[in-house]
């Protein structure tokens, strides 16, 4: 037991953690200190204040119940411990966030390209009197693209994490305390350890307090534990676990009923809420899968660019080019490899999907989270409100020795039961009179099930059920006016009220409560309207029914009544409920049972089934009771029919659990793990549970345990999605690869910690999100393969220009017209492509093996389709030059004469003279034709990019945005070359319409080639073609 001296030694240490041994001072780095603090916060809550004797507690804190703390001790404690407030975490400055968007990932590649362009232009400016401005224009355009895209991304993600601000909203503003024998109201931040505080209905608890006096106090712990029912408090120490014990109330939870006096035992960061706040804000969530994919893609593109650039630098030097010329070639090749429009395409594609998901009730806070959900392999789902409706409903009744399913439909069209039974009529009447819930006013036109009520969840469920089954409850209560009442308390576990009888001068006593407590006060039971002695055979039937309903995870209440004798209790009798009652609470007549449950949402079983077929493991993680959790898990299919837990096997074999053999234990594919088991669990043990069982339920879990479960799944290599709505979920939401908060029932804290918010709180919406996430990953692959394919016909002219000395077939500005002009809308249109039929039948992608950009994609884009496109471009180029007198064989090695400004009489293949100006005009016409041919072959590339496996004839052409993309790129290409002024500025020339035609056969060839490739993919799954070309 602690002594008073302990208090001084504590200082500001977190006394939840194990006390540290004194050692020689040791310098600890800030990083290590933060890591140690985080590890400490992850530990289970440890405290002894709830188990200490009250005298010892008062002595330790130098306080008393009569006078409270003295002002001297308050001042000392304030100086030592600081204010009762949460320490705000270090905020990332907005300019740092902006710079991350501007220079992170793909943007850096474009910045390097822009800098190289400016460098190349600088070399030209120093060397030439009239330098070519292409590199300068390209550098400027690249810079503008990065700045615009960076600003757009920053704007999209500006709603950054504000977790601690949400916690601040939960902090109570004022507290009523006892100091120097006087009750005073103070700012809650001024509360100190040892303060005696007074709490009443409607207050927010100002700190973690030990209850020392209590009158029916109930607190809403849902934000901390996930339990939707208000929890009663008491002065008794009832559990070793501080979260479970009744004599503690926690900082920022709400008092919903009664009054209490308590002693402050923890303030600020040391409170349970403070620990969760610091844990949530201290966790790093790491890079998203799509960010890692883009990083991987950058490595590939950079590797290819640098390899080609350096190779041709060496080749050009070996061929006798001047070193300055060779460096310009190097820069040109590297820049030509940069897909300038891809950053904007990826950002826009993710934004479009985010908007699509918002229409389906998934609000995405961070763009990259769109794809993360599609990569998810494990979903750790909360139970209350996500899998269930967060609305207690009467599910079953037991009367006349039968279990009957309750009909809670609005029009009473569900399963019918005998409403003519006199027992049922008595049970319904008593349920109506016992329920203290009431409908809020001005809701006459609202359906019963949608009406708002005052009262706790169970009372509300009874009120609505009786209203639907019998009729107007308020009329029943008005005709049977309440005379007196003994409220429910945690000791008696029942509630009693006495009512005037309708059309009679007598009184009716009614009771509801824990079935075993109600039954022990009864001597008779009503069966088929007749009162009969309560015999053993009836009690046995009752016990079986009680066990069955309890086994379904339902909350069971018992009901009884007693007609008070008129001669002993005449009209006007004064009933006493304090101390000794003057009316009987024994020898009552038992009526039956009502059982309630928070029912599963209708769409959830189908959603869980879809997850299973998509290879996603759904794990339930809840703060609720294991029996309830297991029942809901079975109801929604998380534990599927036929799969058993170890307890089920032992029950079926009728043997003790410990007697199960290893083989029998291994045959249990499902398991329900109590949070207590996770308290001191080693990583290896948790990993074994996660590996050995396909269907898992974690019940009675703390925030720290939820976090441990997420980390355990991530150790297995899983991409983890976590759903939650309470403050207790925020650390797990933050740590998960994608945190999904509830929009309706979710706390502000959980919403800020999450990456995505479900606007309808429905688990089925997550499955929709998974499908959209998988679809955008597929469609991003299609956009990238489409965009990268045109890189080869863009790079190869430059390489031919260097290697074979031909006139430049494609200019730098023309490349920009493709990457930032004609290719942009078609690439974005692929984001609208519908899912291929197998999208939710395949397993989640493996982040290590299944890359966004892999060798097969590069091989197809560069080595196959890209080569065909380059051939088409050169075919058109050579045709036009041949038509103008320069045969292909004559062009090789002609570059130095062609670009010589002083040579104005260059002879062509047929002996005609060409001035420098004439040559440049035909060169620009050839570049325009090359550009136009790329657009024509990109038609086929866009169409084949629609699917990765299916035939176009299976997929169809129903993507109207893509159809518009085909028209757009054609119209834009025509506009750029035929509009006076625009064509001059972009160094394009209007050309004969016949020169659009040479690319058409190649376009058809690309389409036929890829149809055959995909046909072979479908015919021989897993064969050579799939291994080499399926991207």
Curated annotation (Swiss-Prot):
PROSITE patterns: ATPASE_E1_E2. The chain crosses the membrane at residues 102-123, 136-155, 297-319, 326-354, 795-818, 857-882, 924-944, 961-986. One of its GO terms (biological process) is intracellular sodium ion homeostasis. Signal peptide: none annotated. It comes from the Eukaryota. It is a multi-pass membrane protein. The active site is at 382 (4-aspartylphosphate intermediate). GO terms for molecular function: ATP binding; ATP hydrolysis activity; metal ion binding; P-type sodium:potassium-exchanging transporter activity. It is an enzyme of class 7 (translocase). Residues 7-23 have a biased composition (Basic and acidic residues). Keywords: ATP-binding, Cell membrane, Ion transport, Magnesium, Membrane, Metal-binding, Nucleotide-binding, Phosphoprotein, Potassium, Potassium transport, Sodium, Sodium transport, Sodium/potassium transport, Translocase, Transmembrane, Transmembrane helix, Transport. Mg(2+) binds at residues 725, 729. Residues 1-33 are annotated as: Disordered. The sodium/potassium-transporting ATPase is composed of a catalytic alpha subunit, an auxiliary non-catalytic beta subunit and an additional regulatory subunit. This is the catalytic component of the active enzyme, which catalyzes the hydrolysis of ATP coupled with the exchange of sodium and potassium ions across the plasma membrane. This action creates the electrochemical gradient of sodium and potassium ions, providing the energy for active transport of various nutrients. This is Sodium/potassium-transporting ATPase subunit alpha.
């Amino acid at each position: 037991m602690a002594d008073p001296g302990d208090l001084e030694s504590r200082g500001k240490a977190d006394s939840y953690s194990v006390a540290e041994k004194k050692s020689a001072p040791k310098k600890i780095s800030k990083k290590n200190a933060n890591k140690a603090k985080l590890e400490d916060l992850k530990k289970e809550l440890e405290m002894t204040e709830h188990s200490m004797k009250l005298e010892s507690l008062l002595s330790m804190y130098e306080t008393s119940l009569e006078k409270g703390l003295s002002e001297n001790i308050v001042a000392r404690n304030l100086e030592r411990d600081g204010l009762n407030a949460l320490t705000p975490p270090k905020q990332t400055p907005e300019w740092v966030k902006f710079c991350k968007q501007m220079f992170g990932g793909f943007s850096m590649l474009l910045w390097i390209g822009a800098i190289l362009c400016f460098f190349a232009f600088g070399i030209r400016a120093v060397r030439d009197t009239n330098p070519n401005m292409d590199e300068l224009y390209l550098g400027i355009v690249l810079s503008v693209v990065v700045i615009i895209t960076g600003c757009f991304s920053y704007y999209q993600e500006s709603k950054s994490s504000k977790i601690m601000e949400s916690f601040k909203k939960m902090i109570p503003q004022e507290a009523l305390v006892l100091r120097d024998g006087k009750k005073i109201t103070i700012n809650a931040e001024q509360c100190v350890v040892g303060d005696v505080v007074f709490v009443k209905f409607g207050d927010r608890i100002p700190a973690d307090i030990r209850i020392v006096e209590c009158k029916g106090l109930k607190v809403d712990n849902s934000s901390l534990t996930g339990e939707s029912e208000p929890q009663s408090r008491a002065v008794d120490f009832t559990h070793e676990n501080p979260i479970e014990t009744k004599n503690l109330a926690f900082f920022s939870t709400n008092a919903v009923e009664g009054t209490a006096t308590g002693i402050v035992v923890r303030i600020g960061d040391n409170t349970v809420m403070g620990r969760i706040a610091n844990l949530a804000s201290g966790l790093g969530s790491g890079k998203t899968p799509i960010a890692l994919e883009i990083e991987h893609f950058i490595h590939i593109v950079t590797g290819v660019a640098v390899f080609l650039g350096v190779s041709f630098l060496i080749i050009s030097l070996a061929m006798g080019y001047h070193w300055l010329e060779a460096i310009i070639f190097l820069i040109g090749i590297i820049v030509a490899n940069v897909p300038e429009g891809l950053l904007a395409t990826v950002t826009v594609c993710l934004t479009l999907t985010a908007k699509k998901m918002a229409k389906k009730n998934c609000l995405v806070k961070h763009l990259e989270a769109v794809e993360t959900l599609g990569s998810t392999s494990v979903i750790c789902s909360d139970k209350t409100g996500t899998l269930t409706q967060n609305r207690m409903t009467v599910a079953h009744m037991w009367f006349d020795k039968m279990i009957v399913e309750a009909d809670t439909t609005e029009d009473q069209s569900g399963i019918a039961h005998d409403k003519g039974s006199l027992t049922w009529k008595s049970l319904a009447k008593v349920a109506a009179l016992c329920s203290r819930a009431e409908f809020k006013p001005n809701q006459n036109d609202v359906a019963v099930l949608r009406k708002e009520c005052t009262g706790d969840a169970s009372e509300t469920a009874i009120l609505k059920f009786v209203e639907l089954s019998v009729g107007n409850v308020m009329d029943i209560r008005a005709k049977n006016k309440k005379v007196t009442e003994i409220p429910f308390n945690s000791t008696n576990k029942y509630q009693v009220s006495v009512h005037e009888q309708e059309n009679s001068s007598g009184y009716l006593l009614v009771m509801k409560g824990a079935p075993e407590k109600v039954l022990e006060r009864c001597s008779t039971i009503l069966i088929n309207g007749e009162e009969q002695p309560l015999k053993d055979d009836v009690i046995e039937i009752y016990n079986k029914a009680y066990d069955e309903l309890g086994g379904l995870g339902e909350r069971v209440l018992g009901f009884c009544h007693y007609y008070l004798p008129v001669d002993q209790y005449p009209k006007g009798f004064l009933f006493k409920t304090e101390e000794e009652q003057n009316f009987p609470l024994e020898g009552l007549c038992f009526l039956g049972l009502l059982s309630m449950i928070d029912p599963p949402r209708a769409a959830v079983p189908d959603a869980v089934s879809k997850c299973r077929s998509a290879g996603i493991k759904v794990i339930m993680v809840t703060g609720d009771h294991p029996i309830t959790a297991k029942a809901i898990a079975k109801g929604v299919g998380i534990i599927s029919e036929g799969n058993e837990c170890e307890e089920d096997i032992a029950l079926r074999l009728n043997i003790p659990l410990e007697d199960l053999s290893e083989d029998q234990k291994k045959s249990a594919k499902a398991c329900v793990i109590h949070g207590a088991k996770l308290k001191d669990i080693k990583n290896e043990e948790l990993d074994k549970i996660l590996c050995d069982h396909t269907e898992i339920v974690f019940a009675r879990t703390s925030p720290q345990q939820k976090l441990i479960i997420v980390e355990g799944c991530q150790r297995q290599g899983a991409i983890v999605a976590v759903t939650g709505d309470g403050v207790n979920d925020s650390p797990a939401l933050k740590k998960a690869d994608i945190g999904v908060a509830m929009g309706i029932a979710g706390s502000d804290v959980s919403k800020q910690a999450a990456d995505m918010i479900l606007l309808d709180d429905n688990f089925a919406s997550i499955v929709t999100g998974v499908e959209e996430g998988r679809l955008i990953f597929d469609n991003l692959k299609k956009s990238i393969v489409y965009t990268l394919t045109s890189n080869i016909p863009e790079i190869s002219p430059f390489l031919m220009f260097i290697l074979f000395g031909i006139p430049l077939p494609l200019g730098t500005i023309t490349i920009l017209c493709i990457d930032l002009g004609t290719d942009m809308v078609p690439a974005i249109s692929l984001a609208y492509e519908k899912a291929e039929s197998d999208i939710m039948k395949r397993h989640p992608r493996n982040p290590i093996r299944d890359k966004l950009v892999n060798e097969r994609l590069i091989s197809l884009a560069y080595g196959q389709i890209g080569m065909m496109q380059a051939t088409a471009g050169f075919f058109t180029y050579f045709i036009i030059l041949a038509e103008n007198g320069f045969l292909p064989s004559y062009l090789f090695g002609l570059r130095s004469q062609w670009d010589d400004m002083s040579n104005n009489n260059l002879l062509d293949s047929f002996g005609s003279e060409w001035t420098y100006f004439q040559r440049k005009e035909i060169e620009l016409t050839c570049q325009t034709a090359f550009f136009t041919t790329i657009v024509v072959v990109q038609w086929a590339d866009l169409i084949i990019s629609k699917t990765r496996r299916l035939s176009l004839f299976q997929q169809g052409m129903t993507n109207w945005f893509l159809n518009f993309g085909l028209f757009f790129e054609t119209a834009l290409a025509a506009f750029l070359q035929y509009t006076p002024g625009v064509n001059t500025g972009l160094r394009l020339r209007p050309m004969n319409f016949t020169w659009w035609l040479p690319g058409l056969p190649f376009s058809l060839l690309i389409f036929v080639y890829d149809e055959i490739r995909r046909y072979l993919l479908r015919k021989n799954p897993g064969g050579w073609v799939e291994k080499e070309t399926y991207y």
